[in-house]
A protein has these predicted regions:
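Acidic, glycine-rich active-site loops and adjacent beta-strand->loop/helix elements
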Residues: 86-88, 145-152, 174-177, 332
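Active-site-adjacent substrate-binding region
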Residues: 207-222, 283-325
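Active-site metal-coordination/substrate-binding segment of hydrolases
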Residues: 79-141, 146, 341-344, 348-353
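Zn-dependent metallopeptidase/amidohydrolase metal-coordination segment
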Residues: 299, 304-368
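A short beta-alpha structural unit
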Residues: 234-239, 247-255, 274-293, 313-316
Length: 368
């Protein structure tokens, strides 16, 4: 059956690429809240178009008030969930071609969102379409879930989980290969002081953050483990708010640390200053040899003939909030620094390869 699935993806390739181009041409940057469009009209229109395409492929669809939507194949309570996102970051400067043009050259497509994340989630839709067209009867239904707020806060997924039960297994195609079995925790910490404390405040920030190693060694927070690596500080932001000075820092931390350790350690050193956590996600970890991870590794190795040993990531995906899913693709080893950048790209060959990997992933998980 694997070979039939692979051949079906090849047959669907041209149609898939055209639909991907249609979606990446839509400028789905977050806009102003409107009635019926919580993340702005452009994202709402993009979700409408994706669900229209899914309906044309014969899927049942559901739009959850333009927060998020999904296409489903099969019936049942416990389902396999594959979640990506349609919202994109602003385009910025430095593009060779119009950033929403889906410009094709030498086997590459250049466009904001082609990698992060419209292209990959559309390959998942077509992977499921191949399964449906082959009339493969899976043991569980499968949902392709189209998020609309991954870049700015996960409010889409929060809304989804208030109205729908989570999947029993699945993935998000918004990271890298091979399958990612663990994500670091993430904590955004704010340190604030009154204006009259300006000298003390900047001395502290310079000493422990701006003129320090990013592993938080000066703070005594240079925790590390074999799987996750060392703690990392990133995303420094300095603000002046209502007679207060505020410094924000994000900790990407390994599983042998806790949020309490981070906050209390900084509080001990930042005397007379306020230290608060404004956002936090716990580390996510699955066993490397659990059935879901093992079968996704098998799908990756079957198509690419590369080593599928599961890996960890310092990044953050929907897996932080959506239970029972792992990051899986779309970037192959060596492909870095593409998303969020000018001239964001993806090879057409890689889009097709992703669709094949994802189709086998659906097939393997669906037959459990």
């Amino acid at each position: 059956m694997e070979e039939e699935i692979i051949k079906k993806i090849d047959m669907l390739s041209l149609k898939m690429i055209e639909d991907i181009k249609t979606i990446v041409k839509m400028p789905s940057v977050e806009g102003t809240f409107q009635q019926g469009a919580p993340f702005g009209k452009d994202i709402a229109l993009t979700l409408d178009k994706v669900l229209e395409i899914a309906q044309s492929l014969g899927f049942e669809t559901k739009n959850l008030d333009h927060y998020i939507g999904y296409a489903q194949y099969g019936k049942g309570e416990d389902y396999i969930g594959i979640i990506g996102h349609l919202d994109v970051v602003p385009t910025g400067l430095g593009w060779k071609h119009l950033p929403f043009s889906a410009y094709e050259e030498d086997g590459y497509i250049y466009s904001r969102g082609i990698l992060d994340n419209k292209g990959p989630i559309m390959t998942c839709l077509y992977a499921l379409y191949a399964i449906k067209e082959l009339n493969i009867k899976l043991h569980k239904p499968v949902r392709i879930i189209f998020g609309c707020d991954e870049e700015t806060g996960f409010k889409d997924l929060e809304y989804y989980l208030k109205h729908e039960k989570p999947p029993v297994m699945g993935w998000t195609p918004d990271c890298k290969y091979p399958v990612v079995y663990a994500e670091r925790g993430r904590a955004v910490i704010e340190i604030s002081a009154k204006e009259k404390q300006v000298d003390e405040f900047f001395l502290f920030i310079n000493n422990y953050f701006l003129n320090a190693n990013t592993n938080a060694e000066k703070l005594g927070l240079d925790f590390k483990d074999e799987e996750f690596g060392i703690n990392e500080m990133r995303n420094f932001v300095l603000k002046h708010e209502k007679s207060k000075l505020v410094f924000s820092v994000t900790f990407s931390y390994p599983a042998n640390m806790t949020l309490e350790t981070i906050v209390e350690t900084i509080r001990e050193k930042a005397k007379n200053m306020e230290v608060t956590c404004v956002q936090h996600y716990f580390p996510v970890k699955f066993e490397k040899d659990c059935p879901m991870v093992s079968l996704l590794s098998k799908a990756y190795e079957k198509i690419t003939h590369l080593d599928g040993t599961p890996v960890t990531t310092t990044g953050g995906t929907y897996a932080k909030l959506m239970p029972h899913i792992v990051p899986f693709g779309p970037s192959f080893p060596g492909q870095k620094g593409i998303g969020h950048q000018p001239n964001e790209w993806m090879k057409i060959e890689d889009l097709n390869t992703n669709a094949k990997i994802y189709a086998l992933g659906i097939y393997y998980l669906g037959m459990l």
